[in-house]
UniProtKB/Swiss-Prot annotation:
It comes from the Bacteria. It comes from Bradyrhizobium diazoefficiens (strain JCM 10833 / BCRC 13528 / IAM 13628 / NBRC 14792 / USDA 110). Belongs to the universal ribosomal protein uL15 family. The keyword Ribosomal protein applies. GO terms for molecular function: rRNA binding; structural constituent of ribosome. Residues 1-42 are annotated as: Disordered. One of its GO terms (biological process) is translation. Keywords: Ribonucleoprotein, Ribosomal protein, RNA-binding, rRNA-binding. This is Large ribosomal subunit protein uL15. One of its GO terms (cellular component) is cytosolic large ribosomal subunit. Part of the 50S ribosomal subunit.
Amino acid sequence: MKLSDIADNAGSRKKRMRVGRGIGSGKGKQSGRGGKGQTARSGVRIKGFEGGQMPMHRRLPKRGFNNIFRVEFAEINLDRLQEAVDAKKIDAGSVVNVEALVKGGVLRRAKGGLRLLGRGELKSKLNIEVHGATKTAIAAVEKAGGSVKILAPAKEEGEAA
């Protein structure tokens, strides 16, 4: 057997049908698309249309709303802070705040402020300034000999002080 002897099985590749080549071909005139109108044209799929049945997006009830005043906090856990101290990304002696974390590459940004969460263990004594913190996080920082200062909510750029 040679590479030149290899061929597809008979009938495995069906010949492409060229449509619109006269009624004698069997696929002339409407080319198998039914009647006229929108669906006879190319590239048309009516999104969400279920053949006249009430579509899913109208069968389901509306719920909730989008609060335009919602504040999104960047969140950081204690274990991540400890990793940053161990990797010398932040200095344990100085104040740990948003600016220090961004400068050290721990956070990318904290637009609405920073919130401290209590997952993990903190061994270093840190003085932390955040916009929010959980009770367990505050307790863990104070147990390690540090302190947590809660700041006023961060103001958006262009917002009146």
